[in-house]
Each structure stands twice: as structure tokens, then as C-alpha cells.
Swiss-Prot record:
One of its GO terms (cellular component) is plasma membrane. InterPro entries: CYSTM1_HM_Tolerance (IPR051671), CYSTM_dom (IPR028144). Induction: Down-regulated in root tissues but up-regulated in shoot tissues in response to cadmium (CdCl(2)). The gene is CDT2. The chain crosses the membrane at residues 24-40. This is Protein CADMIUM TOLERANCE 2. It comes from the Eukaryota. GO terms for biological process: cellular detoxification; detoxification of cadmium ion; detoxification of copper ion; response to cadmium ion. It is a single-pass membrane protein. It is found in: Cell membrane; Secreted, Cell wall. Confers resistance to heavy metal ions (e.g. cadmium (CdCl(2)) and copper (CuCl(2))) by chelating them at the plasma membrane of root cells, thus stopping their entry and reducing their accumulation. PANTHER family: CADMIUM TOLERANT 3, PROTEIN CADMIUM TOLERANCE 1. It holds the Pfam family CYSTM. Belongs to the CYSTM1 family.
Length: 55
């Protein structure tokens, strides 16, 4: 039997960028806003994504 492939780490910014490319700006902004809502804080990474997701 073969071992499964190693897990690839994706940064939060990479994940938001991927969502923007796949689903569009509105989806990426909502995804970012909901992430901040779920963790009950606004992190610097979230602000960077919100500022850059529509560029």
C-alpha cells in the first residue's frame, strides 16, 4: 500500500485569493467577513484581504 500524499498548507491570504479567483470578489469578501465574525475579532490578515480582494 502507498502512503497518502502529504498535506499541503495554504495560508489564509492564499485561501482568500483562491476564492476570489474561483467565485469572484463578492464571495471572497463575504468569506473574509464571516471568518472574522466566527473568530470574534478582526485580524490584520482579514483587513488585508478585504482591502485587496477587489483589486
Amino acid at each position: 500500500m502507498y502512503n497518502p500524499p502529504a498535506q499541503q498548507d495554504m495560508s489564509y491570504y492564499d485561501h482568500c485569493t483562491k476564492r476570489h479567483e474561483e467565485k469572484g470578489c463578492l464571495y471572497a469578501c463575504i468569506f473574509t467577513a464571516l471568518c472574522c465574525f466566527c473568530c470574534y475579532e478582526t485580524c490584520e490578515c482579514c483587513l488585508d484581504c478585504l482591502c485587496c480582494c477587489c483589486n
